[in-house]
Amino acid sequence: VYEKYDLNAIKSNPNLYGNENLLDYLDKFGFSTLHSLSVSGGNKFVKYYVSGGYTHMKGLYSGVGRDRFNYSAKLDAYIVKGLTLSLDITGNRSNNKNTSYTTIDAAYSYSPLQVLRFTTGELASLSGSNPLLAVEGLGGYIRNKTNFNTISATLNYELPFLKGMSIYLKATVDNNNSINTTFSSPETTRTFSTIPAPETLPA
């Protein structure tokens, strides 16, 4: 419980006592969109199924988002009596930017009396950092690109002399990779005592 004296001190010293809520600096909502398409068909010799999808997600603060593409294809082919070939292809590609759980955690960890930005517009130094650097997309970015692909082929043969028995040959190839890119640029944060005094004009 704050006394009237404390409240007056907070109001009259905005560079010393904050009245902050980091959640106010975040966007009110994020969103995601999903698009998908699938096609299937065939005949008694060949059957196929192909699908693809795209997802876009926007986060709650500057520059945070994700784009993801995924695809799947399946082919079943009758070659000769008792011999079939199945081919499966799956994969996805993702592009994530500035994804971080610590920024949201910071929204709840800082005291509302902590000054985040001085009246001069400069960012306050909180042990050399400031959560608004991430919220406003300052200081650089982190981007993560992933690519996962799998191809699987199965050749199955039903033994004509042993009803219900079959043998198969299966091969699988995986191609997975990930690229992380980090870009940093220096940003200035200040403590209250280091804010330069406004220049005064000579009388």
Which positions does each model-derived feature cover?
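Small-side-chain secondary-structure face that scaffolds active or pore-lining regions
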Residues: L60-R68, T90-N92, N98-T103, N147-F148, ...
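Short secondary-structure subsegments characteristic of cysteine-rich extracellular domains
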Residues: R66-Y78
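Outer-membrane beta-barrel transmembrane strands
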Residues: K28-K44, G53, F69, L133-T182
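Membrane-spanning beta-strand positions in outer-membrane beta-barrel proteins
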Residues: K47-S51, Y78, T84-D88, G164-S166
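Acidic/polar loop-and-plug regions of large Gram-negative outer-membrane beta-barrel proteins
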Residues: L7, P14-L16, K97-T150, S193-P202
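Extracellular loop and loop/strand-boundary signature of outer-membrane beta-barrel proteins
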Residues: L22-D24, M57-Y61, K74, E136-I142, ...
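Residues embedded in well-ordered regular secondary structure
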Residues: V1-S62, Y101-T102
